[in-house]
Amino acid sequence: MSVRRTVAGPIRIRGRGLHSGSPLTLRIHPYGEGIVFRCAGESVRAHPGNVTGTFRATTLGGISTIEHLMSAFAAASVSSALVELTAPEVPGLDGSARGFADAIAEAGTTVLGPAPQRVVGGTVTVRGGPTSIVIRPGTGRWSCTYDLGERWPGALTVRATLPGEYGAAVAWARTCVLAEEIPQARRAGLGGGLDSGSVVIIGPDGYANPVRAPDEPARHKLLDLIGDLWLAGVPLDLMDVTAIRPGHSTGVRAAALLARQWPEDAVR
């Protein structure tokens, strides 16, 4: 039986915005009506229909970079929480979801009651150029390929059974960037909260800084995909997912297709 789950107690996390670099505080409160982000009087529900941007991050309304926190929520099966922010961006922390996952584990979770069963009714496929995401009813077998073609490191593939292996295989993987993209990202005002310890820099023939695993970029892409798909609220262990070069745009499109299976769960 599916259940609605929230955090068992309040959580406070301080950090800097992943892209803005501005200091901010995030507070997570027990809540009973889905996942809601709130900042400066704006409240927006976590749902693919409320996504307003997918460039380098997933943005809900005016609140950006929600995917790492959403990924940690998915792994802990947290389907309801009130997330309050002092600035319209989720903290970047170390570039991964580990800080969020650890904070949720420390606070614990509690069951609110039964929830409508979110079962994938058939194969969901999203394609766009070299990118593809295929979702089938399943038991939590996930595969993600990070593929730069002829550019180093070529193709990296990671597989995990979720949510059980999330902490060991996914949560700690940091965001990644191509070395040649850094100047452009800085000019666009992105990555201001990242440093060499919180991002994997991919050079033309090797990593430009220490990595936590040789396939860390693929693991982070899986982390992001988990967060984007959690917008549809399907438990991780009820899907088998195969993704090749996923990005936030295709991840949110896939979440939207999943969410269409439950029209009663309308955007609000």
Show where each model-derived region lies:
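Short acidic-hydrophobic catalytic motif
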Residues: M1-R268
